[in-house]
Amino acid sequence: MRIKVKLVRGLAGKRKDQIKAVRSLGLKKVNDERILEKNPMVLGNINKVKHLIQVEEVE
């Protein structure tokens, strides 16, 4: 199963651990999108920054 992740809010003023989580998902700027494999590391990072991103499941 794969998921599409999109950064919808900026990182200005966010904590360093949140910025690292967004970067580890491969997102750099607002409106960046990545399609990632669903695994525990990715899901943990998504959970940490769920207020900054938009997530969709992709077949």
From Swiss-Prot:
InterPro entries given in the database record: Ribo_uL30_ferredoxin-like_sf, Ribosomal_uL30_bac-type, Ribosomal_uL30_ferredoxin-like
Signal peptide span: none
Pfam families, A to Z: Ribosomal_L30
Domain of life: Bacteria
Keyword 4Fe-4S among UniProt keywords: no
PANTHER family given in the database record: LARGE RIBOSOMAL SUBUNIT PROTEIN UL30M, MITOCHONDRIAL RIBOSOMAL PROTEIN L30
Subunit structure: Part of the 50S ribosomal subunit.
Family to which the UniProt record says this protein belongs: Belongs to the universal ribosomal protein uL30 family.
NCBIfam families: rpmD_bact
Protein name: Large ribosomal subunit protein uL30
Lineage: Bacteria, Pseudomonadati, Aquificota, Aquificia, Aquificales
